[in-house]
Curated annotation (Swiss-Prot):
This is Acetyl-coenzyme A carboxylase carboxyl transferase subunit alpha. Residues 40-293 form the CoA carboxyltransferase C-terminal domain. Its EC number is 2.1.3.15. It comes from the Bacteria. It catalyses: N(6)-carboxybiotinyl-L-lysyl-[protein] + acetyl-CoA = N(6)-biotinyl-L-lysyl-[protein] + malonyl-CoA.
Length: 317
């Protein structure tokens, strides 16, 4: 059962008719609805093509947040073998918003870091809706240090609206944890590939996304603040989020043209939530190619190239 976004109403109406016809045919075998269903399926595809070929920034934001969009756990199950999650920051507690550990990726030992939002009420509460606390970033630092020590490539999958802004998180050094994680990403002497698979929100995202290669899924977003947050600050009106999204340049196309990311991973027709397996496979191929390109580079080269990449970004924007 699909959760339809508001701009998907034409698709919803057509697929609703298909469901009704299938139900009618199952109740009365004398009724043949095959031809009509076939025609409607063609119209559904045409509607999806028409709508998704001209999504605006706000609509892409909605797709990036779609509740059925594949999350970190979905990628981990498919892309990684022998994934062994590590827990805790060795200072305060465990933070389930960041999942991190060791695994094999197509036979190669790697370190994995990702943000998990959860997919139902219970798991969303467990993972704090994908908004990490300081302990999550300090756990990421543990994994990065381990990867650097043992020469393991790092793969990070980004999907967060932003770091958790609660009082407790601030008291325990949220800003410092984000800064240290960013610094560690920039400093490791191993390949680091980052992919924004949904939302890339502010420092909460960049803390694990300062990679040698940074990619975005076609309908993901990456920004310093959410459109709602920007609208609240600029106009004191969060309902102007659509306007803010347009002006913030948050889409994959915008960020590729600005040189912030290295590439865009195409999504299936209608978004990643309509065919999770294919987008996960495509993401795996891109990661594998990136790691292959960097395999012959020394640790110093990898670190210097990564640092220079982000220094240039600040100079040239």
């Amino acid at each position: 059962m699909h959760n339809y976004l508001d701009f998907e109403k034409p698709i919803s109406d057509l697929e609703g008719k298909i469901i009704e016809l299938k139900k009618l045919a199952s109740e009365d075998e004398s009724i043949d609805t095959t031809d009509e269903i076939g025609r409607l399926e063609v119209r559904v595809r045409e509607a999806i093509v028409e709508i998704y070929s001209k999504l605006n920034a706000w609509q892409k934001t909605q797709v990036a947040r779609h509740p059925q969009r594949p999350h970190f756990v979905d990628y981990a199950k498919t892309l990684f073998q022998e994934f062994t999650p590590l827990a805790g920051d060795r200072k305060f507690s465990e933070d389930a918003a960041i999942q991190a550990g060791l695994a094999r990726f197509r036979g190669q030992p790697v370190a994995v870091i990702g943000q998990e939002k959860g997919n139902d009420t219970k798991s969303r509460l467990k993972h704090n809706f994908g908004s990490p606390r300081p302990e999550g970033y300090r756990k990421a630092i543990r994994i990065l240090e381990m990867a650097d020590r043992f020469g393991l490539p790092v793969i990070s999958l980004v999907d967060t609206a932003g770091a958790y802004p609660g009082v407790g998180a601030e008291e325990r050094g949220q800003a410092e944890a984000i800064a240290r994680s960013t610094e560690m990403c920039l400093g490791v002497k191993v390949p680091l590939v980052s992919v924004v698979i949904g939302e890339g929100g502010s420092g909460g995202a960049i803390a694990i996304a300062t990679g040698n290669r940074v990619y975005m899924l076609e309908h993901s977003i990456y920004s310093v603040i959410s459109p709602e947050g920007a609208a609240s600050i600029l106009w004191r009106d969060s309902t102007r989020a659509r306007e803010a999204a347009t002006n913030m340049k948050i889409t994959a196309e915008d960020l590729k043209s600005l040189g912030v990311i290295d590439g865009i991973i195409s999504e299936p027709l209608g978004g990643a939530h309509r065919d999770p397996d294919s987008v996960i496979a495509a993401t795996g191929d891109v990661i594998a190619n990136a790691l292959g390109e960097m395999a012959s580079r020394s640790g110093e080269q990898l670190r210097n190239e990564r640092r220079q990449k982000f220094l240039n970004m600040g100079r040239n924007l």
